[in-house]
Amino acid sequence: MEIKGFSFSAVEAGIRYQDRLDLGLIYSDHPVVAAGALTTSLVKAAPVLIDIDRLEDGCAQAILVNSGCANACTGEAGMEVAFVTGELLAKELEIKPENILLSSTGVIGEPLNVRAFRDNISPLVQGLAPDNFEKVAQAIMTTDTVQKVCYHSVEIDGVDVHFMGMAKGAGMIMPNMATMLSFVITDAQIGSAQLKEALTPAVKKTFNRITVDGDTSTNDMVLVMANGGAQNSSIKSGTQAAEDFQGALQYVLMDLALKIVADGEGASKMITIRVCGAREDAEAEQVARTVANSSLVKTAFFGEDANWGRILAAMGRAGVPFDPYQVDISFGDVTLVRDGLAVGRSAEDTATAILKEKEITVCIDLKSGKCCEEVYTCDFSIDYVKINADYRS
Amino acid sequence: MEIKGFSFSAVEAGIRYQDRLDLGLIYSDHPVVAAGALTTSLVKAAPVLIDIDRLEDGCAQAILVNSGCANACTGEAGMEVAFVTGELLAKELEIKPENILLSSTGVIGEPLNVRAFRDNISPLVQGLAPDNFEKVAQAIMTTDTVQKVCYHSVEIDGVDVHFMGMAKGAGMIMPNMATMLSFVITDAQIGSAQLKEALTPAVKKTFNRITVDGDTSTNDMVLVMANGGAQNSSIKSGTQAAEDFQGALQYVLMDLALKIVADGEGASKMITIRVCGAREDAEAEQVARTVANSSLVKTAFFGEDANWGRILAAMGRAGVPFDPYQVDISFGDVTLVRDGLAVGRSAEDTATAILKEKEITVCIDLKSGKCCEEVYTCDFSIDYVKINADYRS
């Protein structure tokens, strides 16, 4: 897929490692509507701080992104360097620096290699082409094992609207407002307020529902740019068109979010924790999140052990009131626990077979209300520890 | 050490595995003062529910404990079986069942093997001897690799008072009121209200400050029995004697708590996270606990990587306000981060050498107040995953 007006480029800039794409550019041939959802961590990387400011006018023309260095915990010097990288690009593209969004991912606390930018901005801009989207998706990978992109189109008000999304992230993933990095472009015609209105709930239901290891990054961000090329009548709040747009955006973000979970560091399985029968959505989410973050639950999944006791134990510390002897738990369509008690050995044997699959849904019914939420996670493997004991070396 | 009036026994009852001590008994030759701190998990094992009730009168004569089965999530049947085990023991000892405290540890959700109790209560009672304390400490081990005991004596009001403590626990350890299991006996003369008064703050500063994996067990408990044999004048609240007693009890609990962390599942290092300069104790604790529970921080310690960026990132999601650019972080006596910024490569190299040690203290100074708290944890290793992927098989 291509979207007219957008072009992309990526180069091997040697920011931290040689011989890999590590500097990417998303460019629109004119300033377009933009919105973002950025990390809620108190410790925010320099590019996050800059983007919060630059997104205020709801307008952007380019996203400059690097892997290899997060430019986080780098103080005034880190801010200064980030500004310099933007200015280098602005000069090369002959656009305003304020319309460039910056994004970094990689090791925290090390200075950004500004020389790598200086030497490579020119070839980066020269490489811009409408079919280079996936090269950028590759350039933003760190411990990811696969590139993560999503192409989607939907009819809004009788007009075809297109979306192209990418994401990266495999560890330090329990986004709170955004994942590590995700960029989506669309040709929808939409105002910046309406774009923000669509983005916030879409992020809440997608990136904010995944967890690999319970850690929230300093650099998390989702950025969306909409250039209006589809020429639909501009989307107004509260209309069917707004609902369709939000649905399509959420589809793209969910696809990317699940790709992140499936590629979680060391993950061998994707696990959906669905909590139903809660009194409130927030309680359902809290229970699901506590289970999804339990190291004991996640190692049991890795061991393909239908250890529902660990699930109930995790639920018990979630801080949400429920009656343990009303709880049902099933793996796929096999009920393991009914009214808080084991159904029996043969159900466990069937569940153990289900655990050999790559995608598993755990349903927890609290039977005390009508609210339901899902959280998406992966198992906790030996490779997770290997990857993270080793990441910087 | 022995304490007159107390005797101990343990047998191989075959509750889950053969050829290992798995049933233990702590017995006092008369009913004595007792207090407990039990799990705050909403999901409470049968013995926990029974003990909460039986501790109300502040009096007990025996503790019956088994490993191999937690008797948690077992409903009415589990309660019934627990009562039966107590009655079997009461009959054999010719004491009141209400004076027997019950304790179980092991797999959740499986029925307790009552026959193993029936067949072994008699040899268990026959084996009672004043020097069998460590046999009970062995009988309560599950994934523990070493028995954990602590002997301590202290002068209170001019009289020598003795303490004998044991604990077990290696995984599912983020106690909230208690660790998995810990039993302490003492010959102090003290009322039940005063004993409870001493126990609560002592648990708060010790077992409630350790975390192996962020999971709180359904079976956590600390039980203390005091038989008055030291013949000190009974300890009154608010006196020097009360302070001395509380200090001694806290010493014993801290010793046992740190032994649990050092023997954390798969642990290769013990790590103290000390947060200073906080505005409130609770904020210091919250920051320390968030860092101590971060999988990324813990895997970095396993990898002996002085990755302070992960520490700052974890702090950023702790929900506690602080200025990242005021934070100092040191490993041992090496300052790695000053005012939120890296001190430099040579400090990191020195810190990396410190990480090769078995016990490491991380000091985090928020520089925004005068409050300090410590949380104790261990690293997150490949073996943790192996142990927990494999525990039930």
Swiss-Prot record, chains A, B:
PANTHER family: ARGININE BIOSYNTHESIS BIFUNCTIONAL PROTEIN ARGJ, ARGININE BIOSYNTHESIS BIFUNCTIONAL PROTEIN ARGJ, MITOCHONDRIAL. This is Arginine biosynthesis bifunctional protein ArgJ. It is found in: Cytoplasm. It catalyses: N(2)-acetyl-L-ornithine + L-glutamate = N-acetyl-L-glutamate + L-ornithine; L-glutamate + acetyl-CoA = N-acetyl-L-glutamate + CoA + H(+). Pathway: Amino-acid biosynthesis; L-arginine biosynthesis; L-ornithine and N-acetyl-L-glutamate from L-glutamate and N(2)-acetyl-L-ornithine (cyclic): step 1/1; Amino-acid biosynthesis; L-arginine biosynthesis; N(2)-acetyl-L-ornithine from L-glutamate: step 1/4. The keyword Cytoplasm applies. Keywords: Acyltransferase, Amino-acid biosynthesis, Arginine biosynthesis, Autocatalytic cleavage, Cytoplasm, Multifunctional enzyme, Transferase. GO terms for molecular function: glutamate N-acetyltransferase activity; L-glutamate N-acetyltransferase activity. It is an enzyme of class 2 (transferase). NCBIfam families: ArgJ, PRK05388.1. One of its GO terms (cellular component) is cytoplasm. Its main location: cytoplasm. The record marks T105, G106 as: Involved in the stabilization of negative charge on the oxyanion by the formation of the oxyanion hole. The gene is argJ. It comes from Desulfotalea psychrophila (strain LSv54 / DSM 12343). Heterotetramer of two alpha and two beta chains. The record marks A178, T179 as: Cleavage. Its EC number is 2.3.1.35, 2.3.1.1. GO terms for biological process: L-arginine biosynthetic process; ornithine biosynthetic process.
